[in-house]
Amino acid sequence: MEVKTLDVANFLARIQKQESTFESLSKFSPTQLKELATCIRHRILEVVSSNGGHLSSTLGAVDLIIGMHLVFDANTNPFIFDVSHQAYAHKLLTGRWNDFSSLRQFGGLSGFCNPKESPSDYFIAGHSSTSISLAVGAAKALALKGSASMPVVMIGDGSMSAGLVYEALNELGDKKYPMVIILNDNKMSISKPIGAISNYLSQILTTSIYQKIRDTIKKVLTKMPDSATYLAKRFEESLKLITPGILFEELGLDYVGPIDGHNIELIIATLQRAKEMRKPVIIHAQTLKGKGYEIAEGRFEHWHGVGPFDVSTGSSLKSSAPQSPTAVFSESLESYLTDEKVVGVTAAMPSGTGLDKLIEKYPQRFWDVAICEAHAVTSMAAIAKEGFKPFVAIYSTFLQRAYDQIIHDVGILGLPVRFCIDRAGIVGEDGETHQGLFDIAYLRSIPHMVLFAPRDNASLQQAVAFAYRYNDSPCAFRYPRGSFTLEEGVFVSNEFVLGQAEMLKRGKKILLVGYGNGVGRAYKVYQALITEGYEPSLLDLRFVKPLDKHMLNEVFKTHTHICVFSDSYYMGGVASALLEFMAEENIKDVQLKSFEIKDRFVPHGNTALIEQSLGLDTPHLVSKIKEWI
């Protein structure tokens, strides 16, 4: 029985009880589905304006996600969202409407899909371009189980730039596993519609007529005599030439679109047809980022990821903050651009890494290569070989995606590529997939790699200066998101000298060793211990590779307890480096304790609350140290 009027309260009550969204939505009329989309957008705006999050992409994907849940049962068909920052509507339709107010909060809902949060989230997501590979694997598993279910993928046009997508499409075009891939094109970066002809093609391609023509031609081809086969094949190929999806067609996939990603009736009809085809189908849907929120519709990039804001004006509710490390890095790097050998690259994060203004001012020397971290690194290796000074500005979590290239293309030849690692350490609300905690461990093992870290904005300027001067091997320096823990001006900033640490405070017995942002944490502990009558020393390690062996040999002779602080993992991290040094030097009369992060993935939430949960806030640290000594 069709629902006469959209009773949102009753509908939401049903899905809160985990009743089937699939069955409930099937009773809605197109008008009611549009009303539901409006309600979902209002809820997203309500929460994101309070908590922050990804806004414009998720507003644009609402209609498509409603269509997915109406045509496919998410309980039996794996819904796989690439990155999944656009999947808020999916969360709201799968029993999380009330809990949505906890989005990105410590202990609350993740800003991305996570099976630990809900069985409706098929797979963890956060990094781009993994969805089609996951879908291929899921389709294989379903086939092995004898299931008629199929994966349903949503992937954005930005994610289509990464090589992993085409590795998956290569196999998919050969094996023909049944699945539906929705290409959510919200930037018009793949194919822009052109007038009436484009509209006409879109209408043709979203009906069964086009597919019937293609299927009929293929059947006829098998029955034609050899003399006519050539002409028939050419006729079939000519059909591809009038579609925007030639690339996908040539890979052996069926392409539908482009369609209007906000026309709910068209979306449902297209998805239903794709479902019936029982083969890999790509639906190219064009959507508007920020759909339903007029202020966001006009400023796409600004509204991609946002902090709390006033819905009525769009104004940020964040209080003024000191200059971010990202901004300091950008300004510092620009000061060296009188040297025409200085160049830079980022992978789809120009504003996030501070290279956006440099790309605008110096387009011949700074590049955004899209979501292609591996290509970014390898291309800079060649530039370094030609005598230039490349700076690779990249988030810690995304540099992981280019690890082979760092070793094979940069490391083996010892090329002087500078890795500027933004968002190092605990990044807060983006959670497990984005915490920048691995870089020290995975870079420290690479022969001849130099690793160093600033403690505040002033020393970050010195770090950029050192990277500019250093030309003997690859090097990397890391800095946090938002701000350093250490307040500006506490210590005078000196030049970085290869492999030299800096003693900030001399005391006795207890040595607090900080690295990078860990210096700020160590300094807070230092202040607390001083008030309780202790006299610790405070050392800024500055370089974790190479270590200042002369300084370490000196201080290890005069201290009995070494406390190590760094925003990184213990395994392979700073304490590991110091323990290796102690083993090599046969130092036995010193105890060392790491206050890094142990063997666990760190969840999302406010950074201070995360640190408290990990026992890394000052009261916990001081208590542990006092108990230890």
From Swiss-Prot:
Cofactor remark from the record: Binds 1 Mg(2+) ion per subunit. Binds 1 thiamine pyrophosphate per subunit.
Say if the entry is tagged with keyword Calcium: no
Pfam families documented for this protein: DXP_synthase_N, Transket_pyr, Transketolase_C
**Cofactor section:** Mg(2+); thiamine diphosphate
Q: Which GO terms describe its cellular component?
A: cytosol
Which residues span the membrane?
A: none
Instruction: List the GO molecular function terms.
Output: 1-deoxy-D-xylulose-5-phosphate synthase activity; magnesium ion binding; thiamine pyrophosphate binding
Listed pathway(s):
Metabolic intermediate biosynthesis; 1-deoxy-D-xylulose 5-phosphate biosynthesis; 1-deoxy-D-xylulose 5-phosphate from D-glyceraldehyde 3-phosphate and pyruvate: step 1/1
Under catalytic activity, the entry for this protein gives:
D-glyceraldehyde 3-phosphate + pyruvate + H(+) = 1-deoxy-D-xylulose 5-phosphate + CO2
Which keywords does UniProt give here? Isoprene biosynthesis, Magnesium, Metal-binding, Thiamine biosynthesis, Thiamine pyrophosphate, Transferase
Q: Name one GO biological process term.
A: 1-deoxy-D-xylulose 5-phosphate biosynthetic process
EC number(s) of the enzyme? 2.2.1.7
Q: Give residues annotated as binding thiamine diphosphate.
A: 85, 126-128, 158-159, 186, 293, 373
Could you tell me which SMART domains the record lists for this protein?
Transket_pyr
Binding-site list for Mg(2+): 157, 186
Which top-level group of life is the source organism from? Answer: Bacteria
Q: Does the keyword Transferase apply?
A: yes
Q: How does it assemble?
A: Homodimer.
Q: What is the documented function of this protein?
A: Catalyzes the acyloin condensation reaction between C atoms 2 and 3 of pyruvate and glyceraldehyde 3-phosphate to yield 1-deoxy-D-xylulose-5-phosphate (DXP).
Q: Which family does it belong to?
A: Belongs to the transketolase family. DXPS subfamily.
* Identification of the protein by name: 1-deoxy-D-xylulose-5-phosphate synthase
Task: Look up and give the organism this protein is from.
Answer: Helicobacter hepaticus (strain ATCC 51449 / 3B1)
The taxonomy runs: Bacteria, Pseudomonadati, Campylobacterota, Epsilonproteobacteria, Campylobacterales
What gene does this protein come from?
dxs
